[in-house]
């Protein structure tokens, strides 16, 4: 079927998303609900392999995203060859055990009071749906770019619309 991928392709692209995000965990995140500020801002993802379809962010309680609500996050990999648009819900989840689990030196640099900093908020982004693109232009596609020509879809990479970013789904 044109424009649709086999399940194995979707599984591969979801796995690639989490690998690329672990390598470069920076996303643009913004609230999308009515009356919300419509601009996204950069946040550093804290990934927990035990949480499916969830990304955590440390932010100040005074951060405009800290109020939570419907949100979108955009991701571009370090090599600019993988892209993700994630839709979901952002909410504060100040679970001390999760803060301990995700805490690191980079986060500590932003919060002088450490894990008990009064301005510290752990934001939980629960992903409801995602659209993922991986650009892996084939050799023939690269030659067409260099010398002119039309790149066919099969030469340009992978694309998937998914309801879960879990790396595998039960049969």
Can you say where each PLM-predicted feature lies in the sequence?
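C-terminal edge-of-domain segments
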Residues: 2-5, 120-171
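A short, Trp-centered hydrophobic/proline-enriched beta-strand micro-motif
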Residues: 19-36, 71-75
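Short active-site oxyanion
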Residues: 51-55
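A short, well-structured catalytic beta-strand-centered motif of the EAL phosphodiesterase domain
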Residues: 44-47
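Short His-Asn-centered micro-motif
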Residues: 58-60
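Positively charged, polar, low-complexity stretches
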Residues: 16, 35-42, 65
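N-terminal leader/targeting segments and the immediate start of mature chains
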Residues: 1-26, 164-171
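Short, structured beta-strand-loop surface elements
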Residues: 64-128
């Amino acid at each position: 079927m044109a424009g649709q991928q086999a399940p194995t392709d979707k599984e591969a692209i979801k796995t690639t998303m989490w690998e690329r995000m672990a390598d470069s965990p920076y996303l643009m995140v913004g609230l999308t609900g009515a009356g919300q500020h419509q601009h996204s801002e950069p946040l550093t993802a804290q990934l927990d392999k035990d949480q499916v379809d969830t990304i955590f962010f440390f932010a100040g309680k005074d951060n405009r995203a800290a109020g939570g609500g419907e949100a979108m996050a955009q991701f571009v990999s370090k090599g600019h060859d993988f892209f993700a648009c994630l839709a979901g819900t952002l909410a504060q989840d100040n679970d001390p055990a999760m803060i301990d689990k995700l805490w690191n030196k980079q986060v500590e640099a932003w919060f002088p009071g450490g894990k008990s900093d009064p301005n510290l908020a752990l934001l939980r982004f629960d992903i409801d749906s995602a659209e993922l693109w991986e650009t892996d232009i084939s050799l023939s596609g690269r030659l067409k770019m260099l010398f002119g020509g039309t790149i066919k879809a099969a030469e340009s990479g992978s694309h998937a619309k998914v309801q879960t970013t879990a790396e595998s789904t039960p049969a």
